[in-house]
Amino acid sequence: MSSKIKIDDLANPLLTEFQQATKDFGETLKLELTSEAIINEAFKNSGLQDFGDEDFISRLDVLMRSVSNDEGLAGIGKLGVFNDQVRYLENRLKFEKFKKKFPEYHQEIISQPIIIIGLPRSGTTHLLNLIASDSRLKSIPYWESLRPFQEKLIDLENEKDLRQEEAFKEYESFLQTMPLLKSMHDMHPNHIHEEIELQAMDFSTYLPEWLAHVPEWRDYYLSHDQVNHYQYLKDVLKAMQFIRGPKKWVLKSPQHLEQIPALIKTFPDATFAITYRDPLSVVLSTATMLSYGCLLYTSPSPRDPQISR
């Protein structure tokens, strides 16, 4: 039986030398938190220019304005948000390239998926990994969710598939900066992950709420119907299924709990597995994890009022 880990410096963080150096480095950065800067970076990194439907730009505008208004977000936190949005745009560009090369992917049928929904910290990840151990089912390892489209497949220059290697490098850095998060929610590249990273390619998820204090984004996201964005997710799943079977999916995301109508409309023949945990325990667990993340990503110290909200 593993021993309990007690974190006693959430109110007054005691950073390691590496954590402090990382945080100090973040404060030296001059980041432009705008849609234009993120789009230009994605163009430069990918060598691609076609986003397809560009309606996402207005959503990205709202998101980045909301992030910019977070006065408590440290430089390294801003860098994390910036890099994430660039990666989502690169993935979107590669998806558009994929669609042009393999238009027949759209004939794929997402049939009778198993979809796990439940509150954060209620065991959804454990249940997902348990069910996904059945080799008859298709699921998404974390490394693949980060970069779903192999560059060689869409005729880009990189002949070697480096996606897993990149994910492991990022994981090692993650363990150095936030070592205790492994005990809270281990983001090992090979663990089976939720589809939120795919949804983020269309810039309409609750994910930013985990990364920054973004009430403007939260209100904007919740005020808009999400069916089209869930259809976008389904389209990406069709592409991934076309690339590599099998054809019966197991999926999960706590976000689905607040989007059940859109989820059912998109996947009407799904089987839903709903986890339950005492909501008080959920709140305590979530607050602990967010507070620990704030040690590095907020400045000057954790922001208890925002976390409690």
Where are these regions (language model features)?
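Conserved phosphate-donor/acceptor-positioning beta-strand/loop module used by diverse small-molecule
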Residues: 269-287
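PAPS-dependent sulfation machinery
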Residues: 146-249
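Long, basic/Gly/Ser/Thr-rich N-terminal segments
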Residues: 2-79
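Extreme N-terminal, non-catalytic leader segments
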Residues: 69-111
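Glycine-rich phosphate-binding P-loop
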Residues: 116-132
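Post-Walker A helix-loop "phosphate-sensing" segment adjacent to the P-loop in P-loop NTPases
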Residues: 134-142
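ATP-dependent NMP and nucleoside kinases share a basic, alpha-helical "lid"
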Residues: 255-274
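Conserved small/polar residues in nucleotide/adenosyl-binding loops
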Residues: 297-302
